[in-house]
Amino acid sequence: VGTGFPVIFMLSSLFMGIGTGATIMIAQFYGARDLEKVNQTVNTIYTALIIGIIPLSLIGIFLSEPLLRLMQVPDDGTLAMAKTYMIIIFIGIIGNLGFNINSGILQGLGDSRTSLLFLMIATVINIILDLVFTIPIKLGVAGVALATIIAQIASWLFGVFYINRRYDF
């Protein structure tokens, strides 16, 4: 699981940077009470997420093994497990990136506590599903990855729902 983190982080960093820029713009527009520009910025960032997620997922899926080999991950079973984990994570990477974008939007709106709450909920979901997928179902590393993406996608969708219900822009 930890072996694939540097690759996942490297390929996700672009969206983290975009999210940071959006946070700054949203904060400026929201502070100026220009809700139309807040809305445009939020829509633009979600559009960038949707458009960019497919190429990012495909790049991550297809480069998983070559990048793990470049990192000299041993081929004693560790490589296969790390590759399985990474492929599943990249299939569901929209949850991670979507959560980060929602977090940036909320921070730009002056609400940093709600994204922390969604993160805590995702953590509880992840722990419960880790136990379910690895003990009774025995999915191993694939179960851990599946639990992670389900928790992240749930957290992202909670955020989308909250932002749409709470903020009128």
Where are these predicted regions, by residue range?
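Cytoplasmic helix-loop-helix junction between adjacent transmembrane helices
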Residues: M71, D75, L79, I89, ...
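Hydrophobic/small/kink-forming positions within alpha-helical transmembrane segments
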Residues: G17, L58, T123-I127, I153
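Hydrophobic transmembrane alpha-helices of multi-pass small-molecule transporters
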Residues: M10, N126-D130, W156-V160
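Hydrophobic/aromatic residues in alpha-helical transmembrane segments
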Residues: A22, L63-S64, N102, L129-D130, ...
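Alpha-helical transmembrane segments of multi-pass membrane transporters/permeases
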Residues: L49, I105-L129, L146-I149
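Short alpha-helical transmembrane segments in multi-pass integral membrane proteins
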Residues: I26-G92, K138-F169
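Small-residue-rich hydrophobic transmembrane alpha-helices
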Residues: V1-P55, N96-S115
